[in-house]
């Protein structure tokens, strides 16, 4: 039986109740077979092209870094059906579930984007769908909750703990433990127990593959850096995967610094966490001195996650990727600027990556550099949040 590597350096693994091991083993074997099956790959490719709208554009910005020598491109995952990069890997996993004969899909969601993507894939592929969502996030993201329901998904609010994403993850795993024979757990990020981090990366890697082809066609060279926001880390690993072996391309992940790292209200476990076991994996975690999981915080529900995918932890440990952070205010400024200067409303998640790119462009305006930001999603879901914050600040 061929096996994928369960670890990235010291990170990853499979820390789950024994009852789930057969389900994870089955998933791993089916994934290995599917990756070698031309008809599976063709069906996935067709869905991505005909249904989701790939390849997505690589857009050169016109105004936002006009007074610098930086050339800035945006990889437009916001243009994907469903509004974010989430759709890519969800279609892949849903096809895998069908291949395994599973009729039901269980998912967790924070911002609601993964829930929406899962709901649309289940509607398309005729699978029963239930989505666990922290009760707080249900309030924060009502448009996405309604979208899921419109597409036939059952949305289950989770009131335990902090009533956010980590609690939804726990409930989803609990459900799967009871129902794994008929249900597939469609995990929403490149984290969790093996083989999920690998599967999600492989079903997102077209982001970086397309970017590489597109930038070579437009600029005749590879970028100096690719930049992506990091919550669980799937959009970032999708962008990074095809560039890992290109040693001259910097890989920069941007975590949410929330109200400031020093306040403790942030979601930056890579740079400011401790290694522990959470959500079925060994990874950096936000923990207090007793080793309890700390609440993460970010203006953006999709980055509000107290851990991170194991491959990111490994890339940091070996020095191949670097990880910065952006505060709520910096992300908000980048959000407003992209709206005003380019006519694109980005997701608050993606705005963190953009904020760091702008920092790089403006800290040395005379530096010639070619940067690509993964614009991982569109900001329609965030306009009410932003409206309320700007109103509070007296800006509108």
UniProtKB/Swiss-Prot annotation:
The protein's name in its UniProt record: Tryptophan synthase beta chain
Superkingdom field: Bacteria
Family: Belongs to the TrpB family.
Residue numbers of N6-(pyridoxal phosphate)lysine PTMs: 86
Enzyme Commission identifier(s): 4.2.1.20
Function field: The beta subunit is responsible for the synthesis of L-tryptophan from indole and L-serine.
Gene Ontology molecular function terms on file: tryptophan synthase activity
Pathway info: Amino-acid biosynthesis; L-tryptophan biosynthesis; L-tryptophan from chorismate: step 5/5
Catalytic activity: (1S,2R)-1-C-(indol-3-yl)glycerol 3-phosphate + L-serine = D-glyceraldehyde 3-phosphate + L-tryptophan + H2O
CDD domains assigned: Trp-synth_B (cd06446)
Subunit-level organization: Tetramer of two alpha and two beta chains.
Record key words, sorted: Amino-acid biosynthesis, Aromatic amino acid biosynthesis, Lyase, Pyridoxal phosphate, Tryptophan biosynthesis
Cofactor: pyridoxal 5'-phosphate
Gene that this sequence comes from: trpB
Enzyme class: lyase
Cellular component, GO annotation: cytoplasm
Pfam families: PALP (PF00291)
